[in-house]
């Protein structure tokens, strides 16, 4: 909590923001500093590093699943970090919320499609779809292979045991899929349920077209054409009462967040002080730990950050 609050205090939102220059508490004291203070990034970085060191000493670490030859399986790693508990080997959740997540709780109900008695209300907006990297670890507008025109001609097969793309292990997208959804990073497929993606519980592809089985104009359909997939068991079929509806933890904080917060704070301070050479290796270490787990190429320099 301390590291998160110090990161907030260092951010331009409240660090020297003229919008809050006269914002005072009941005692008449300024709540936020009226002039920008780069040293707040140092305090944030120190708090994040302390949190990392203490967490790792206590046995916390990034959740990673490996394939048969010991290599990282980014699909299963980024999927199960949101599903598995401490007792199942997940040592990443530093601040869990042990609240029920049964079908009639709003999240799971809203993330299910209409034909299977779901509300279809947990939609994903296009901006988030666009924010995920391509398979090469690049923003979509920086990857010349990215296209929003036409449909794929081939099946995208990768080295993973994940089978929730087409219903077959290792197949991420089938032929005939809108190219916007092709050749994206693993976290995209774990997080977003898009059109023509395999629905394990329904044993068919999703149909988010207007007047489709999962689409509008019904109010029980996502108007963006996407549903959230993260933390939802793809086998869930509320209509038949099948699939996995067991309670799952929520995560107020994961070790991955602290890694990125530490890198951000150290990077921002380096911008002010011109200490890229001294801090580059440390910054990239923690950013690349996240990228490696996600199955995308590492950053080689700070020019990308």
Predicted segments, located by residue:
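Extended substrate-binding grooves/exosites of carbohydrate-active enzymes
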Residues: 131, 140
């Amino acid at each position: 909590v301390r590291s998160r609050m110090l990161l907030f205090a260092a951010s331009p939102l409240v660090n020297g923001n003229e919008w809050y220059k006269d914002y005072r508490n009941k005692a008449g004291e300024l709540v936020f500093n009226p002039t920008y203070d780069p040293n707040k990034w140092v305090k944030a970085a120190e708090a994040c590093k302390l949190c990392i060191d203490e967490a790792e000493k206590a046995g916390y670490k990034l959740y990673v699943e490996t394939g048969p030859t010991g290599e990282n399986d980014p699909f299963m790693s980024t999927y199960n970090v949101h599903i598995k508990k401490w007792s199942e080997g997940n040592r990443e959740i530093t601040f869990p919320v042990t609240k029920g997540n049964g079908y009639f709780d709003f999240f799971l109900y809203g993330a299910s499609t209409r034909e299977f008695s779901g509300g279809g209300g947990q939609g994903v907006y296009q901006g988030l779809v666009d924010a995920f990297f391509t398979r090469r670890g690049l923003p979509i507008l920086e990857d010349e292979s990215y296209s929003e025109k036409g449909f794929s001609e081939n099946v995208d097969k990768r080295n993973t045991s994940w089978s929730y793309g087409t219903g077959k292990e290792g197949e991420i997208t089938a032929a005939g899929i809108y190219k916007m959804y092709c050749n994206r990073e693993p976290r995209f497929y774990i997080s977003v349920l898009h059109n023509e993606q395999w629905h394990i519980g329904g044993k068919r592809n999703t149909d988010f077209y207007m007047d489709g089985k999962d689409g509008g104009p019904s109010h029980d359909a996502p108007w963006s054409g996407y549903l959230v997939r993260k933390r939802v068991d793809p086998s869930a079929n509320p209509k038949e009462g099948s699939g996995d509806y067991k309670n799952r933890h929520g995560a107020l904080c994961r070790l991955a967040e602290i890694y990125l917060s530490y890198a951000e704070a150290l990077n921002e301070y380096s911008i002010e002080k011109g200490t890229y050479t001294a801090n580059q290796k440390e910054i990239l270490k923690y950013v690349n730990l996240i990228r490696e787990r996600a199955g995308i190429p590492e950053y080689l320099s700070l020019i990308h950050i």
